């Protein structure tokens, strides 16, 4: 057979993106969908335990939390997809993932969308910065031309293997070295016409006026367009006289709201304080931590990791597993409480 007779789109697969359908349903029926930013599987599970709508794999959180790097596109597409896959497998929530600029040209963008879909991600966001990109709140960012950006988003939409997968287009025009407010708004219109599901206008500060103005201006021409809002961890929201509320943003049409580095800041602050106490007070640091996590939903790392389920699977297939569990010490369904030396034998 001649190679020209083969199906040339062998890298495309039929993907049934159930989580994307769930996300779309929430976007269409709720005032807004909120997802805290995070970077690892346990955070995704904790988001589900605490009642969130979705889990957001933040790019900055991933590169800092997993690699210790700044958000300067120093991590590859495959590394990002692998992290997203781990999060997808750890939760029943829809996972929304940072796809940066698509990691190169048109072919890279298309591959990135498909790899994220195969990993089980419900939505991806792609931005219009030049490559390598940087966090939207690190000085020095530039945007590609309108033509290149439009092609990038059209390629992303066309590459979808499931019609349900949500594509979010981010524009960094406002605050970039070669953009301005008018470009910010016009690019949102261009990207909407390119077929994306949601437009995310990255803002350089927590201005209420800018958020309101953007929604009003773009909805003059695209009244049904859904917007995304980054309630950014780079901003001091608590110091604003009248900070935007999630409900206000939802009413303006910002249907997807997220805090990019919430999980990282929450974790880093807690770990720093506890490590510091441990360094200064030795075992008292452990005692203090125990007083806070005992009888808390996060008390047992065994329960957080579903050890009982894995033990059940083990006993189903290994005839000796039940005997070993019953005759040895350690966590089991019969011994699930934290271990002390006073436990009865």
UniProtKB/Swiss-Prot annotation:
Binding of substrate, residues: 58-60, 136-137, 170, 230-234, 260
Catalytic site: 135 (proton acceptor)
Catalytic activity: D-threo-isocitrate = glyoxylate + succinate
InterPro entries: ICL/PEPM, Isocitrate_lyase, Pyrv/PenolPyrv_kinase-like_dom, Pyrv_kinase-like_dom_sf
Magnesium recorded as keyword: yes
Superkingdom to which the source organism belongs: Archaea
Residues engaged in binding Mg(2+): 98
Cofactor(s) listed: Mg(2+)
Similarity comment: family membership: Belongs to the isocitrate lyase/PEP mutase superfamily.
Record function comment: Involved in the metabolic adaptation in response to environmental changes. Catalyzes the reversible formation of succinate and glyoxylate from isocitrate, a key step of the glyoxylate cycle, which operates as an anaplerotic route for replenishing the tricarboxylic acid cycle during growth on fatty acid substrates.
Protein name: Isocitrate lyase
């Amino acid at each position: 057979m001649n190679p020209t007779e083969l199906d040339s789109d062998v890298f495309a697969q039929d993907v049934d993106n159930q989580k994307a359908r769930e996300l779309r349903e929430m976007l269409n029926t709720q005032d807004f969908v909120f997802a805290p930013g995070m970077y690892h599987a346990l955070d995704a599970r904790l988001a589900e335990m605490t009642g969130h709508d979705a889990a957001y794999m933040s790019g900055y959180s991933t590169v800092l939390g997993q690699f210790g790097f700044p958000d300067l596109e120093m991590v590859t597409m495959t590394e990002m997809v692998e992290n997203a896959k781990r999060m997808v497998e750890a939760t029943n929530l829809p996972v929304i993932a940072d796809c940066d600029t698509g990691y190169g040209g048109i072919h890279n963008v298309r591959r990135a969308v498909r790899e994220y879909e195969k990993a089980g991600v419900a939505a991806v966001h792609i931005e219009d910065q030049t490559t390598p990109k940087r966090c939207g709140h690190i000085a020095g960012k530039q945007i590609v031309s309108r033509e290149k950006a439009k092609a990038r988003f059209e390629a992303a939409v066309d590459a979808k293997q499931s019609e349900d997968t949500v594509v979010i287009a981010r524009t960094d025009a406002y605050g970039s070295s070669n953009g301005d407010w008018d470009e910010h708004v016009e690019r949102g219109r261009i990207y909407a016409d390119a077929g994306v599901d949601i437009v995310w206008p990255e803002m350089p500060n927590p201005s209420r006026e800018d958020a309101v103005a953007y929604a009003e201006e773009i909805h003059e021409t695209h009244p049904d367009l859904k917007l995304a809002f980054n309630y950014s961890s780079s901003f001091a929201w608590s110091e604003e006289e009248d900070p935007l509320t999630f409900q206000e943003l939802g009413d303006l049409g910002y249907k997807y709201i997220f805090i990019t580095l919430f999980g990282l800041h929450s974790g880093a602050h807690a770990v720093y304080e506890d490590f510091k106490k441990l360094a200064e007070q030795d075992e008292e640091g452990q005692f203090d931590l125990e007083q806070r996590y005992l009888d808390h939903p996060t008390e047992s790392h065994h329960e957080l990791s579903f050890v009982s389920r894995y033990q059940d699977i083990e006993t189903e297939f290994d005839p000796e597993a039940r005997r070993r569990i019953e005759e040895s010490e350690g966590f089991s369904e019969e011994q699930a409480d934290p271990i002390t030396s006073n436990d009865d034998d």
